[in-house]
């Protein structure tokens, strides 16, 4: 196993060309890609094929400044039993990220101001990622209720209300900022009854 492959496997299967400033190292990466030992994820980012099919991948390296949201955040906060179909990652609306179709990542384009609140740092499977917090995740469920289905939205709200560490004041603040306060109020009234 050469130095490139050793470094890739020791870092969870993903390397960047910035880690290898030498031209000869770059050529080794290109040759490893040609042999099928590495897959080009995007410009300057390469991965060992097996790493892409793990249950968790290094989102921060593939989509820098991306925020894990929706299904993955609901699963992390134990708000939903729905298995995430892919990694849901929010990025700024004006930003363009080229994603190969083999990666199980679904991008959501949010306004910049919506990416600046309700976000926390989490360590999952040895990777540091940014993810929406519990209250923000509930508001996102209400916001995307027509896309995800009313059953999933109701499940998220019901499970949130059962949590001991819920923060209804913060939930109301986030709902106002995301313009879903009235809809959330209706769901909360129904769930409490």
Question: Where would I find each of the regions flagged by the language model?
Answer:
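Short amphipathic alpha-helical interface segments
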Residues: 1-15
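Alpha-helical residues within the helix-turn-helix
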Residues: 22
């Amino acid at each position: 196993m050469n130095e490139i492959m050793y470094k890739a496997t020791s870092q969870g299967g993903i390397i960047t060309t910035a880690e290898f400033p030498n031209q000869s190292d770059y050529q080794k990466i290109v040759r490893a890609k040609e042999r099928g030992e590495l897959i080009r994820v995007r410009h300057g980012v390469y991965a060992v094929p097996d790493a892409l099919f793990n249950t968790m991948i290094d989102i921060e390296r593939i989509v820098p400044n991306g925020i894990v949201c929706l299904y993955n955040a609901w699963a992390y906060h134990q708000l939903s039993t729905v298995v995430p179909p892919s990694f849901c990652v929010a990025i700024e609306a004006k930003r363009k990220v080229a994603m190969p179709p083999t990666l199980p990542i679904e991008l959501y384009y949010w306004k910049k101001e919506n990416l600046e609140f309700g976000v926390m740092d989490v360590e999952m499977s040895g990777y540091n990622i940014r993810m929406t917090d519990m209250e923000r995740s509930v508001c996102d469920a209400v916001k995307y209720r027509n896309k995800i289905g009313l059953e999933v939205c109701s499940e998220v709200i019901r499970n949130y209300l059962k949590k001991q560490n819920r923060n209804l004041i913060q939930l109301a603040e986030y709902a106002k900022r995301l313009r879903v306060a009235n809809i959330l109020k209706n769901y909360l009234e129904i769930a409490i009854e």
